[in-house]
């Protein structure tokens, strides 16, 4: 069986794609995988994402490749995939989740306690920015774009004191930094689906040979947890650029979901959490989302 896999050209995207291929080979050793490298609209510009359509730009070109028959599946950093996707497509599988947390790379000589000072910290995401400003409103948040290594290089060029990155990206790329600190969930709750690799397919192919193969390699715990997180974002009418954090952890049939929403400048932060059994997932999640909305979560993220 031949499987054409659409992916972005970045080092991280390619590494994630090879991780998918390894898992495909584990369940279907005779499958032939062809990588279809693409440059998304988001890769072709350094403009801030919120001015050019958001992180969905990283996804749309790969979806077009599937729709046009150029590729059979697409590999994504699942946190970059909009909570609402066209019904023509489906997230068919996820790989086991990497570390879902956020990390800060600090200039030599600084410690995490120095975040109480007026430092120059680089991050491009409203979620991270708002949580940083909630810690210290005097921080100077500097927007940054590019792949992980490009961003790290900018620390020296732009005289930055720190850079926020996903711990999963550092782990997958095996990037070591001499002065790194991983945020606790209380300090910075991650984005929905952060650390997870998602595999997208044309919805009509879910029961095809490729679709059935993806069911075999799917990590069910990651799939369920990220689906719950993405449901929260969708229910709050958020997107990849909304200051919404959601993290679901599953052990056996027990789930714990934490959500944090904030306004853009971090002056207003609302936290909510719930524990439930997966057998009662639909009702528990519906009640939880109703609580979020009743307590003004939608209004907060729009401020």
What are these regions (language model features)?
Residues 48-73:
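Short, structured active-site "lid" loops
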Residues 71-75, 161-162:
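Short, Asp-centered acidic motifs that coordinate Mg2+ and/or phosphate
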Residues 11-25, 54-58, 83, 103, ...:
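N-terminal winged-helix
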Residues 1-39, 45-47, 51, 134-303:
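Small-molecule-sensing regulatory modules
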Residues 4-6, 74, 92, 122, ...:
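Short, well-ordered beta-strand segments
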Residues 78-79, 87-138, 205:
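A conserved helix-loop-strand patch within extracytoplasmic ligand-binding domains
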Residues 78-81, 168-170:
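Short glycine-rich anion-binding loops that position phosphate/pyrophosphate groups of nucleotides
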């Amino acid at each position: 069986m031949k499987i054409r896999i659409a992916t972005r050209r970045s080092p991280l995207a390619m590494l994630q794609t090879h991780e998918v291929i390894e898992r495909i080979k584990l369940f279907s050793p005779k499958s032939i995988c062809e990588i279809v490298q693409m440059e998304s609209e988001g890769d072709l510009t350094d403009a801030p994402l919120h001015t050019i359509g958001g992180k969905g730009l990283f996804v749309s070109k790969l979806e077009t490749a599937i729709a046009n028959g150029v590729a059979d599946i697409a590999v994504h950093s699942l946190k970059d995939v909009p909570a609402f996707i066209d019904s023509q497509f489906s997230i068919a599988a996820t790989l086991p989740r990497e570390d879902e947390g956020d990390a800060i790379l600090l200039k030599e000589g600084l410690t995490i306690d120095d975040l109480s000072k007026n430092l120059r910290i680089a991050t491009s995401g409203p979620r991270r920015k708002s949580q940083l400003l909630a810690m210290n409103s005097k921080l100077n948040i500097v927007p940054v774009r590019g792949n992980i290594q490009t961003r790290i290089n900018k620390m020296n060029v732009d005289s930055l004191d720190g850079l926020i990155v996903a711990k999963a990206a550092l782990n997958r790329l095996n990037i070591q930094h001499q002065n790194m600190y991983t945020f606790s969930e209380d300090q910075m709750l991650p984005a929905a689906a952060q650390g997870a690799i998602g595999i997208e397919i044309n919805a009509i192919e879910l029961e095809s040979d490729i679709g059935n193969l993806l069911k075999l390699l799917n990590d069910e715990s990651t799939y369920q947890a990220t689906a719950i997180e993405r449901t929260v974002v969708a229910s709050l009418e958020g997107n990849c650029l909304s200051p919404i954090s959601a993290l679901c952890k599953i052990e056996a049939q027990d789930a714990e979901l934490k959500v944090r929403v904030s306004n853009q400048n971090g002056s207003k932060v609302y936290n909510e959490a719930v524990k439930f059994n997966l057998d009662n997932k639909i009702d528990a999640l519906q009640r939880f989302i109703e609580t979020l909305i009743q307590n003004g979560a939608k209004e907060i993220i729009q401020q």
